[in-house]
Curated annotation (Swiss-Prot):
Role: Di-iron-containing protein involved in the repair of iron-sulfur clusters damaged by oxidative and nitrosative stress conditions.
Organism expressing this protein natively: Escherichia coli O81 (strain ED1a)
Gene Ontology CC, one term: cytoplasm
Subcellular compartments: Cytoplasm
NCBIfam families registered for this protein in UniProt: FeS_repair_RIC, PRK10992.1
One Pfam family per UniProt: ScdA_N
Keyword list, A-Z: Cytoplasm, Iron, Metal-binding, Stress response
Name the UniProt record assigns to this protein: Iron-sulfur cluster repair protein YtfE
């Protein structure tokens, strides 16, 4: 099967660094992971042949860890340590930096107005979301009750969509996370951190939406 006929979420999980490639082209492989590469490329008016060629090159490299076949308990432990704990570190620091940048550079036209507010909203939403997963959903899945978790999973997926929408607002506010020429060191460091957060959050959501939740619902 050609790559163009496969879902973005599947490609992101099966080809090393495909997620970084999709991020470069601003293609949503986490919340929009069920759309095929061809459809996603058409929506962005991108040349699918070029992207397929880049994916073929990436596919020559061995994948570090194939989470598609990992035990669900191992996936959950990985999500908590690699993503949940990391987001809890990332967001408070980014909020502090955004507060400083918005205050110090308030008179500059390029200042990302409202960024502190949007990062704070994301922090509050994610904190509540991750707590619900860790206290309710993940224990259910680990106990083999994932097939009965349709309700909690649909809520989590809906909250993933909301987080994805906030990321789009943050990208819009920051000129696609591109610092202007006059950006100070804090401003540049903050944008590096936001890019890292977006990468991490998209990988995190993709792992849950495209692997953990479907397998749990299937009764594993």
């Amino acid at each position: 099967m050609a790559y163009r006929d496969q879902p973005l979420g599947e490609l992101a999980l099966s080809i090393p660094r495909a997620s970084a490639l999709f991020r470069k082209y601003d293609m949503d492989y986490c919340c929009g992971g069920k759309q095929t590469l061809a459809r996603a490329a058409a929506r962005k008016e991108l040349d699918v042949d070029v992207i397929e060629a880049e994916l073929a090159k990436l596919a020559e490299q061995p994948i570090e860890k194939d989470w598609r076949s990992a035990p669900l308990a191992e996936i959950i432990d990985h999500i908590i340590v690699r993503y949940h704990d990391r987001h809890r570190e990332q967001l408070p620091e980014l909020i502090l930096q955004a507060t400083k940048v918005e205050r110090v550079h308030a008179d500059k036209p390029s200042v990302p107005k409202g960024l502190t507010k949007y990062l704070t909203m994301l922090h509050e939403e994610l904190s509540s979301h991750m707590m619900k997963e860790e206290q309710i959903l993940f224990p259910m899945i680990k106990q083999g009750m994932g097939s009965q978790a349709m309700g909690p999973i649909s809520v989590m997926e809906s909250e993933h969509d909301e987080a994805g929408e906030l990321l789009e607002v943050i990208k819009h506010t920051t000129n696609n996370v591109t610092p202007p020429p006059e950006a100070c060191t804090t401003w540049k460091a903050m944008y590096n951190g936001i890019n890292e957060l977006i990468d991490d959050l998209m990988e995190h959501i993709s792992l849950e939406n495209n692997i953990l939740f479907p397998r749990a619902l299937a009764g594993e």
